[in-house]
Regions:
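Signature of Gram-negative outer-membrane beta-barrel scaffolds
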Residues: 1-79, 97, 200
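Gram-negative outer-membrane beta-barrel transporters
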Residues: 27, 138-140, 160-263
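Short loop/turn motifs that connect adjacent beta-strands in outer-membrane beta-barrel proteins
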Residues: 28, 83, 129-131, 181-182, ...
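Transmembrane beta-strands of outer-membrane beta-barrel proteins
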Residues: 31-35, 72, 86-88, 132-134, ...
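Transmembrane beta-strands of outer-membrane beta-barrel pores
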Residues: 37-41, 90-96, 127, 136-142, ...
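Membrane-embedded beta-barrel scaffold of Gram-negative outer-membrane proteins
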Residues: 79, 85-91, 112-183, 189, ...
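C-terminal beta-signal and adjacent terminal beta-strands/loops
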Residues: 194, 255-261, 283-347
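C-terminal beta-barrel architecture of Gram-negative outer-membrane proteins
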Residues: 229-289, 304, 309-314
Length: 347
């Protein structure tokens, strides 16, 4: 109370140098290279809004970090015919922690920058009425900042560095336009998102007869090849679009598979799969005076009143012995069927 903890001083200096080159190896085969160098100087000085009960004071914020990143990207494009294209690329992406990563982290072990090695190979096809594509990717992470399932004091999601993890999968897309007034677009991603070696920290407690609580030693549990939190294996998006003489209609559908809410892959701490549909209807007309165009419409969200949660928090601990494990979760339930109207004017 009566302490302006938010008046800490922060300064971030970000410098970038880019170099880009393209080269035609043949009339149908080309290569490219994008090079980026980044230098970041990041300082935070002051106190945090978190209280250190051992020192009887607000936690200090003393961040003085410098980052130097070299992020190259190289690739090949092969235009086999005017309709068919193959491509391949390799890139490095490095990213510094955000301010929240520092303020929510442990001052004795501030978060590290994450590094990604990205490998991609893909194919696309396009003609006037059909587009299709497939993209295969493998993303190899060092110190990836992943969600933990926990929240800070104001409800923001917390993250932690994971030394060795990966995301791999295939992205598929299809677009069909058989006539002027109808189009069908669909895309899907199947992925495998894993932590190779995860060490779970499980706090323990003993509940005394006088209703006080005694903290027990934190137990470290090793896990192999666990799901990354909030990373579904399957995403599917579908859209039907109609457009005829000023009338527009579209039906958007999304399927999301089961998600784990922590990185320990606990079956009790998951978000169930869900399938949600939104319907949009609109009509556009052109008045003869003043306005060039008027659009009237409405959107019905969650058309079939699906009961689902798309976010939440989760944690675990033990009482007296590790075998007496407790798992806890909170869920962000989403709205049922709801309607939003809209009007737009063009002068």
């Amino acid at each position: 109370p009566e302490h302006e903890y938010y008046r800490n001083k922060s300064k971030k200096t970000d410098g970038n140098i880019y170099l880009k080159a393209n080269y035609d190896l043949t009339s149908t085969l080309s290569a490219y290279a994008d090079l980026q160098y980044r230098h970041i100087d990041y300082t935070i000085d002051g106190v945090n809004d978190k209280y250190d009960w051992n020192k009887n004071a607000l936690r200090p914020l003393a961040v003085d970090k410098k980052f130097d990143f070299f992020n190259p990207k190289v690739g090949l494009n092969w235009n086999i015919t005017p309709n068919h294209r193959l491509y391949a690329s390799f890139s490095v992406a490095q990213k510094e922690p955000t301010r929240n990563n520092y303020t929510d982290g442990d001052p004795d072990s501030y978060p590290k920058a994450e590094k990604l090695l990205d490998y991609e190979v893909g194919y696309t096809f396009a003609n006037p009425w059909l587009t299709a594509g497939a993209n295969f990717y493998y993303m190899d992470y060092t110190d990836q900042l992943v969600l933990t399932g926990a929240l800070n004091d104001i409800g923001e999601a917390l993250t932690e560095n994971i030394p060795d993890s990966y995301r791999m999968g295939i992205e598929l897309m299809l677009g069909i336009k058989p006539c002027k007034w109808f189009q069908w677009d669909i895309n899907a991603t199947w992925s495998k998102n894993r932590i190779k070696d995860f060490v779970e920290s499980l706090p323990g407690y003993h509940y005394n007869a006088d209703e006080t609580v005694t903290s027990l030693p934190t137990v470290l549990i090793k896990h192999k090849d666990t799901h990354i939190a909030f990373s579904p294996d399957l995403l599917l998006n579908n859209r039907f679009s109609f457009n005829y003489k000023g009338f527009e209609a579209s039906l958007q559908s999304q399927f999301v598979s089961k998600q784990y809410m922590t990185n320990a892959e606990v079956e009790e701490l998951t978000l169930d799969k869900y399938f949600v549909n939104n319907l949009n209807l609109a009509y556009t007309f052109r008045p003869k005076k003043i306005l060039k165009e008027v659009t009237l419409g409405f959107t019905v969200y969650n058309l079939f009143n699906e009961e689902y949660e798309n976010n939440g928090w989760a944690s675990s601990d033990y009482t007296d012995t590790v075998e007496n494990r407790g798992n806890y979760a909170g869920y962000a339930a989403q709205a049922g069927t709801n309607v939003l109207g809209h009007v737009s004017f063009r002068f």
